[in-house]
Regions:
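Intrinsically disordered, low-complexity terminal tails/loops enriched in metal-binding residues
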Residues: 2-129
């Protein structure tokens, strides 16, 4: 009787493992799926974000599946953290990006966070230089 029960449990366990299938680990930051179109840092969340700090300007490009998002009326704040130093920059709509003049030149390892409000929705993007 014990052998029959053991065989039933083993058979049931094998069937359950087959139904469950292989595990699938999934990272929802698809930064490796896309490339930055302007040479900046890329982050994907509610939208695709590209942050570029170059030539005295901070630029944030926002796209949705490769198509530019209308940034009319959008507001954004860029926070850059370098060690204990914190710099906040307000970004304003400018054509197909949000931008601001800046003198900051983040070093490797500095962190950046963008808080964006566009079309009544808020989202956050994080970057590492």
């Amino acid at each position: 009787m014990k052998k029959v029960l053991l065989a039933c449990f083993l058979g049931l366990g094998t069937q359950m493992a087959a139904v469950a299938g292989p595990s699938h680990s999934h990272d929802h930051n698809h930064a490796t799926d896309h490339k930055a179109m302007h040479g900046g840092l890329f982050y994907q969340a509610a939208y695709d974000y590209e942050l570029l700090i170059k030539d005295g300007q901070a630029l944030l490009f926002v796209t949705d599946h490769g198509k530019p998002v209308s940034l009319s009326g959008a507001t954004a704040k860029l926070t850059i953290l370098e060690g204990s130093k914190r710099t906040d920059i307000v970004l304003s709509p400018s054509g197909e990006s949000l931008s601001a003049k800046t003198t900051i030149k983040p070093s490797a390892g500095a962190k950046a966070v963008v808080q964006l409000r566009v079309g009544g929705k808020s989202s956050t993007a994080k970057f590492t230089f």
